Amino acid sequence: TQDMDSFYNALPFILTNSQQTAIEDCIRDMQKEQPMNRLVQGDVGSGKTAVAAGAAYFVYENGCQSALMAPTEILAEQHYETLKGFLEPLGVKVALLTGSMTAKQKKLVKEGLENGEYAVAVGTHALVQQTTKFKKLALVITDEQHRFGVEQRAALASKGENPHKLVMSATPIPRTLALMIYGDLDISVLKELPKGRQPVETYAVTGKLRERAFNYVKKYLDEGRQGYIAVSYTHLTLPT
């Protein structure tokens, strides 16, 4: 559509065929009477966030809001920066809401979501808090949905009136298994990487190779590059 041309023309790169098709799938779904329920699956670096941005822009052009929930603050911040870069040049205001923000920062963001100042919210579990309200939430995007509980996903969806749902996953799942895990979702697969994007290599090692893995990371740090270590969140239990 003419409205989406503004989005495509503003991108600093050309979408892959798979990305273009996935966005068109989302738009077609959202134009139907029943809400969209779609899974976008693709390797790390395949451009799933660009697809989410396209869907969010379509929702914005129709006067509504979108929310993207990520399982960690690191991922939420990455999505926020990416979506902000894609959408704010088009006048779409994007907000970040995470648990580590100050009470004042959270208050300002929540006020902006409730009065419609922000069209897109990106965050962690902070999005599902009772004090987080939206003016007109029409699209809920979940990154790695299996990392969230049923109640958390339902809580976010309940902040809109039967909103459209888009799930993003980098986990390579066979189609039949995806239907078992995610339910009755339509599926879009990103089959190629954007031009110039290097494939991301993933390795799994046992505890016996931990020191070797750390040395591997240190080699890149010594070259001036960056890295991070993510661990499962645990509650500290103090002896009584």
Regions found by a protein language model. Name each.
Residues 1-2, 236:
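Serine-centered coil/turn micro-motif
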Residues 2-38:
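Conserved pre-motif I regulatory segment
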Residues 24, 35-236:
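Inter-lobe coupling/hinge segments of SF2-like helicase ATPases
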Residues 238-240:
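N-terminal low-complexity segments that are often proline-rich with Ser/Thr-Pro
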